[in-house]
């Protein structure tokens, strides 16, 4: 019963991770944040693998899922430090989130709750084919929204890691022993028995 509860809980956690990752992917696409987009895609694939491993009780898939969650926690910790400008990290350095291919920032920078965007015409600071804007009146600055989003990812990943380790501990080591159809699919191959050779006897005919 406890094993079933653990599997069901892990499936729920994976579903929450998928919802959070897809929501984050949408906003990262709108903000042209290519590095987070790539990371989110890998995370979605890993979570799907985790769901598959949980439903079919495949310990190898659960271990891969747990290993990815460690990487995912590290990535989101970096995002938190990046937006809070911890240490030498700066939001104005090299545009890390866009692979230095554009000047776009987080979508929440201009579209946060209560934000008022005002364009600055003919600004000498504007690069070619770009314009300068000022953002004011935000109820919550965009960097804190990104930090909260990453913190949620870390929170779900920690729970997912614990339950993945728990479920994989009680998973069968031999993956071939798993029966998808609850016993109906098991098939033991038996080679056909050799048919005894017929004894040939001469046939005599009378003329």
UniProtKB/Swiss-Prot annotation:
Localization annotation: Cell membrane
Chief localization: membrane
InterPro entries from the UniProt entry: Na/K-Atpase_Interacting
Statement: the UniProt record of this protein carries the keyword Nucleus: no
Annotated transmembrane regions: 2-22, 35-55, 62-82, 147-167
Biological processes, Gene Ontology terms: regulation of sodium ion transport
Bilayer topology: Multi-pass membrane protein
A GO CC annotation given for this chain: plasma membrane
Residues annotated as glycosylated: 100
Swiss-Prot/TrEMBL keywords: Cell membrane, Glycoprotein, Membrane, Transmembrane, Transmembrane helix
Record keyword Nucleotide-binding present: no
Family, similarity comment: Belongs to the NKAIN family.
Protein's UniProt name: Sodium/potassium-transporting ATPase subunit beta-1-interacting protein 1
Origin species: Danio rerio (Zebrafish)
Gene that produces this protein: nkain1
């Amino acid at each position: 019963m406890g094993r079933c509860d653990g599997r069901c809980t892990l499936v729920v956690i994976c579903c929450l991770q998928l919802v959070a990752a897809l929501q984050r992917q949408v906003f990262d696409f709108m903000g042209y944040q290519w590095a987070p987009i790539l990371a989110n895609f890998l995370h979605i694939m890993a979570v799907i693998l985790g769901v598959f491993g949980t439903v079919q009780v495949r310990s190898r898939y659960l271990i891969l899922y747990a290993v990815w969650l460690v990487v995912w926690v590290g990535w989101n910790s970096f995002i938190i430090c990046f937006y809070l400008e911890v240490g030498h990290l700066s939001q104005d350095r090299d545009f890390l989130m866009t692979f230095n291919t554009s000047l776009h920032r987080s979508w929440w920078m201009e579209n946060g709750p209560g934000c008022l965007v005002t364009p600055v015409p003919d600004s000498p600071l504007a690069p070619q084919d770009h314009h300068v804007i000022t953002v004011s009146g935000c109820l919550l600055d965009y960097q804190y929204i990104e930090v909260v989003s990453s913190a949620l990812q870390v929170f779900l990943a920690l729970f997912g890691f614990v339950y993945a380790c728990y479920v994989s501990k009680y998973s069968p080591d031999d993956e071939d022993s798993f029966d998808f159809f609850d016993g109906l699919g098991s098939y033991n191959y038996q080679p056909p028995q050799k048919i005894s050779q017929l004894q040939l006897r001469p046939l005599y005919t009378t003329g």
